[in-house]
Amino acid sequence: MALVRHHHGFKRYAFSVCYDGLKCLGFSFQGAHENCITANGTDLRAVHSVEGKIRAALSALVDGYGRRKNSPWKSNECMDGSNFENFQVSSRTDRSVHALKNTFHLDIRMKDIQLSWEPQKLVRGLNFHLIRNARDETAKILQDCHGALPANLMRSPENDVRIIACKPAPLELLPNKHYNDGPPSSRSQPSHIAWNARFTATSRTYVYRILVHRLPIPQAHNDDADNSSHTSSQMEEYGFPFEAGRSWRIHCQNNFDLQAMTEAANKLTGTHDFTSFRGKGCYRSNPVTSIESIGIQATPFLSSFAFLRNEHDHNNHNNSNNNAEIITVAIKGNAFLYRQVRNLVGCLAHVGQGKTKPGEVESILLARDRSKAPQMAPAHGLYLVDVEHGDFNI
């Protein structure tokens, strides 16, 4: 297998990034399907992928060396940047999935044979252009719409993506830990690689937030019975407006059975064939992955706010009027199949509600059949909180 190298005159950098998944079309760049009105009428103006936003900021900073363009940016124009290449993320998150820390690498052309970009200048410059690009685009849309703000701009896009840190990537070639995935005849990976955000990641940690509440859900008035805006999911947001798009809200009269969930989680920990928990369209040839740990914790809703924790825990932990709690499911593993984490959480939530017994989880796992497992948890409750690269910290 050939070695993967970056071109002469380019230097590889490793970045960490955080983002609000609600405001983005997932991580991966989607070309002409971003910042547009789709064929079915969906208004995606000013809506981009995380990668699309970063590429546009790179285009303004690196290709133009900071020169501001006269016309508003469009992400589908920034794929041809001649001064950066080989953009690779460690974890390609879906639309509405948040990240407290994801990592990626790219190769940036050196200013001359001896002068490369300083990491801190890249961080400051990219964040500057991420904000300015969003402002310019919003202003252009407002001008075109004569001041009428489209629904997708109700949430400001200026603060949805931020570069956290940047470092020059290690120079040495590394063994590719995915080289032995699958039979030799189907191997498409090189045996050794330059530092790569995806293939050198040693662990990924996700946290899923579930809001379990017992508040009565108001019913739509008769006059609004035919109003499609009164959907059950919207009515369930009643009483918890700050959790909209931040957690999976489940209305349940009884507390989740954490002991049963933990018992089920123990059966999922370790190295297994997770075919029953892989998403449709998963391209990975080998469904075997390793889960290092699954931690489950419940916290009264008000106690999830740190400044209220001590007082609320003392006065209200056993109070029957405490109508909600946050359940967090933390899953750490070396790699995951497409939508594996959300499928695992959906199964654990079923167990917590008593709809599936802990002992049945092992049978679901051994069945290697996605149809045997419960429904997948929604995307907006999922957070990628950390990606580790061995001894190399970003």
Q: Where is each model-derived feature located?
A:
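Structured-RNA-binding interfaces characteristic of tRNA pseudouridine synthases
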Residues: A2-N316, N321-I394
